[in-house]
Amino acid sequence: MILVDTCGWIEWLTDGILANKYQVYMQDVESIIVPTSVQFELYKWASRVKNKQEALKAIALTEQGKVIPLTTSISLLAGDFSSEYKLSFADAIIYATAQNEHVELITSDEHFLNLPEVVYFKK
């Protein structure tokens, strides 16, 4: 199991410049941890850039993974990570979910650069 950050889903869905790097992880969607905050960000992005129908298709793909809702324990862990690593709310929730599930976070978001258990792809 792994957690692919929102930027990874976007790269993969749009065949972006890093799509081939994410493809290795996206081949088995069922093995991906998907925080509901990633679903929120992906839906918001796809609705804005594409349309509601495409946004719902993207969310349907995420539903094939293991969707993790925001819980009290993840919220508290995120609060600690936000303070310790100066992460935004959404980034802290995503990182806390990965840590709570004991999986690596796969991302190209610089906010996660050099954090433990992160695989980072430079844009």
For every predicted segment, state its role.
Residues 50-74:
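Short hydrophobic interaction/assembly module
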Residues 28-29, 64-65, 101, 115:
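Structured helix-beta-strand junction loops
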Residues 1, 96-123:
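Acidic, PIN/NYN-like endoribonuclease modules and their adjacent C-terminal/linker elements
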Residues 33, 68, 119-121:
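General small-molecule cofactor/ligand-binding pocket signal
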Residues 67-108:
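Active-site neighborhoods of divalent-metal-dependent phosphate/nucleic-acid chemistry enzymes
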Residues 1-34, 46-57, 123:
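Short, well-structured N-terminal submotif of metal-dependent ribonuclease cores
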Residues 9-10, 39, 75, 112-113:
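A generic structural signal for short hydrophobic patches within well-formed alpha-helices
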